A protein has these predicted regions:
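N-terminal amphipathic, basic helical "cap/leader" segment at the start of enzyme domains
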Residues: 1-81, 176-177
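C-terminal helix-cap and adjacent tail motif
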Residues: 5-13, 18, 22, 142, ...
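Helix-biased detector of long, well-ordered alpha-helical tracts
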Residues: 17, 86-93, 175-176
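Small-aliphatic-rich amphipathic alpha-helix that forms the alpha element of a beta-alpha
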Residues: 33, 83, 90-136
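Solvent-exposed alpha-helices and their adjacent loops that cap or buttress functional pockets
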Residues: 40-43, 74-77, 140-146, 165-166
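Short, charged/polar surface micro-motifs in flexible loops or helix N-caps
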Residues: 53-58, 89-91, 158
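Short, solvent-exposed amphipathic alpha-helical segments in soluble enzyme
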Residues: 65-67, 99-101, 138, 168-170
């Protein structure tokens, strides 16, 4: 297995060529999302929305720029595909489980994209803006009982992916023996 190499190659991509994913690439990424761990196996409480329609990507990009207070910003980075993860609104006590599930799905999709040589970046600001915009949420066909949790932008990267050295020192580790 080459899992650690894929992990070492995965990085946030903020510059895309504009080339759309092939159907096979998209299906591989969606398979990775569907292989993610989901709390209590409640896959019915999760939803993926694949956005490739340019006018909707532009609306989401503008909503994100407004959220950040910078109209010149392009928080989707020109990616031709954005996949939104949404979680069923199961109430405040369980909502965090859906957001954790979404994070696992995003990571699996990012690793699958890396394995395919595609660029990806985890998106939050545009998704927070989406969650606050009922009309845009409706345009994205996200049901009223689902909350946009996170998203991933995907596409052919303008910068080649480079393998990084992996370390155990970036994050504080406390060994309790």
């Amino acid at each position: 297995m080459e899992t650690m190499k894929t992990i070492a190659m995965r990085q946030s991509c903020r510059e895309y060529t504009g080339e759309q994913l092939t159907e096979a690439e998209l299906n591989t990424v969606l398979e990775a999302a569907n292989a993610s761990p989901v709390g209590m196996g409640k896959f019915e409480d999760m939803m993926l929305t694949v956005v490739q329609k340019k006018d909707l990507l532009e609306k989401l990009d503008k909503a994100g720029a407004k959220f950040y207070g910078n109209p010149d910003m392009h928080p989707l980075y020109g990616a031709p595909t954005v996949i939104i993860t949404s979680a069923r609104d199961t109430g405040i006590d369980r909502r965090m489980v859906g957001f954790c599930n979404a994070a696992c799905m995003i990571e699996n999709m990012a690793l699958a994209a890396t394995d395919l040589g595609l660029g990806s970046v985890y998106l939050m600001g545009s998704i927070m803006a989406l969650g606050a915009d009922a009309e845009l949420k409706k345009d994205m066909k996200i049901p009223a009982d689902f909350i946009p949790a996170s998203a991933i932008a995907l596409g052919a990267t303008a910068q080649p992916l480079k393998e990084r050295d992996l370390t155990v020192t970036k994050i504080t580790v406390d060994h309790i023996k």
